[in-house]
């Protein structure tokens, strides 16, 4: 009876080891890391024409994702969709990771798990037309104005709390840029780095920030809730390495070098309603 029990125990343990080994093999068998983003948010993620005229992905987050894939020894596959759908698609298994200048807020932590931060983002900035910039000396000057922000972002929540504001929510930052450039909204609110990028590439826009908009935020990589593929340890190792190598500054410089190309791509087209 004792011998039978021992044999059963050993068999059960062996089966468990085999199962764990199989799970480890499955993780190790990953050959492609699928990266989800919303490529309309320079300098983090955007599309631009390469030397052959083909549209390709560029930006800080794109380079971080490639660095992580290289560290893991796998290929990177980029998938583009609207920002508001990214975390839902992530949990449906459409992506392995999401990078889109995402702050790991408490609300988002309910929908996904997050890596260690790889970048600190300046406080949000308003973008307004240069000819109107003198109207906005204080945060209170935005009360009662029509202000746009990207759908499902913390910026939309911020503008919704401004007294008597008419908040406009759009999926695309490029559409927001057109709205403020054409005077269809008084201002838009975006992340600090994004505002600075568009100010540099659009002569008619000015970036403004105020203490009421808060302080800096930490930007992280998102994985599906519970990290079912066990990706976070390797991702955090890669982030530690790129931080040690000061790669973010290199990636920022690379994005800035594309400013002229980006200006041609992102500049609003003239239309009859302008």
Where are these regions (language model features)?
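Bilobed "Venus flytrap"/periplasmic-binding protein-like clamshell domains
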Residues: 39-42, 55-70, 125-173, 192-194
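C-terminal motif of bacterial Sec signal peptides marking the signal peptidase cleavage site
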Residues: 8-12
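Periplasmic-binding protein-like
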Residues: 39, 120-128, 196-239, 259-273
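Extended ligand-binding regions for polar small-molecule ligands
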Residues: 14, 62-71, 130-132, 151-153, ...
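A ligand-binding cleft/hinge motif common to bilobed small-molecule-binding domains
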Residues: 85, 102-111, 158-161, 186-216
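Acidic, polar ligand-binding/catalytic clefts
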Residues: 62, 75-141, 206, 212-213
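Extracytoplasmic small-molecule ligand-binding "clamshell" domains
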Residues: 22-102
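Ligand-binding clefts/hinges and TM-proximal coupling segments of bilobed small-molecule sensing domains
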Residues: 15-21, 154-168, 206-211, 239-274
């Amino acid at each position: 009876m004792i011998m039978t029990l021992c044999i059963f125990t050993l068999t059960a343990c062996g089966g468990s080891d085999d199962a764990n080994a199989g799970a480890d093999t499955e993780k190790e068998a990953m050959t492609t890391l699928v990266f989800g983003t919303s490529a309309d948010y320079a300098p983090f993620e955007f599309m631009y024409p390469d030397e052959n005229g083909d549209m390709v992905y560029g930006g800080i987050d794109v380079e971080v994702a490639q660095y992580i894939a290289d560290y893991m020894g796998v290929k990177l596959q980029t998938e583009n969709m609207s920002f508001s759908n990214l975390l839902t698609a992530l949990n449906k298994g459409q992506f392995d990771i999401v990078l889109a200048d995402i702050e790991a807020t408490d609300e988002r932590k309910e929908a996904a798990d997050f890596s260690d931060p790889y970048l600190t983002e300046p406080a949000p900035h308003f973008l307004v037309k240069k000819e109107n910039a003198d109207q906005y000396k204080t945060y209170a000057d935005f009360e009662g104005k029509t202000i746009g922000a990207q759908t499902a972002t913390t910026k939309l929540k911020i503008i919704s709390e401004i007294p008597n504001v008419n908040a406009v929510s759009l999926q695309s930052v490029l559409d927001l840029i057109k709205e403020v450039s054409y005077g269809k909204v008084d201002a838009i609110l975006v992340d600090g780095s994004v505002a600075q990028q568009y100010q540099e590439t659009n002569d008619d826009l000015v970036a403004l920030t105020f203490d009421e908009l808060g302080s800096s935020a930490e930007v992280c990589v998102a994985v599906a809730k519970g990290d079912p593929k066990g990706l976070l340890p390797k991702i955090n190792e890669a982030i530690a390495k790129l931080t040690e190598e000061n790669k973010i500054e290199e990636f920022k410089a690379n994005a800035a070098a594309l400013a002229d190309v980006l200006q041609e791509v992102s500049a609003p087209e003239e239309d009859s309603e302008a």
